[in-house]
């Protein structure tokens, strides 16, 4: 019942501040401006990745924990999506988390039901991480995980997180659900699963570009096997990286 309240946001403490944007009543003008600007930036990031924007999610933003939880959110989360309804927590009021959830809606809108149903969860999340550019899931964070020996999924393990259930179990197993406790202790937060997915998808998306990504989606919609189509794109990525490295002049250390 809680997510259903998003269908009537103005009846449950939210006010419309722009097209498809609702914000918890009582928010100051700075927060309103920040959210409107985040909407523009998030849309721009979706367009850059997909070449255009076909989805139009409705954004619901909370400035209090009570508001977020009243719509079905949980304390440790920054954002979540219910169909085409994005819910932002007080910790997720920026373009990064808005773009992340928007990417889920965009790819769901572009895929037919069969293709969407067969798309692995790691891929959906990895695309969203790469597009949203959140510092918490960046290559810098990936290197931090390596340098500090934080447990993280291997590539083979990551590619096995196909269902939402498998994904959420991995997120819990690798400690991403304990970040509030880490923060309270003054310890750095870790996000090995989401960051691993972004690490896998960044070079793949960069090599394909928006046109190649759209061709990939078309092939899935035509009924081609996901793993085969992804592997073809990943082979192109590996060739691109190898060629780029060969093009760099060699330098000797003094």
Where are these regions (language model features)?
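N-terminal functional modules and adjacent low-complexity/disordered segments of proteins
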Residues: 2-3, 108, 163
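Juxtacatalytic substrate-recognition/specificity segment
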Residues: 6-120, 134, 226
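N-terminal low-structure segments adjacent to metalloprotease catalytic domains
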Residues: 1-15, 246-254
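Acidic/His/Gly-enriched intrinsically disordered linker/tail segments
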Residues: 97, 115-197, 206-254
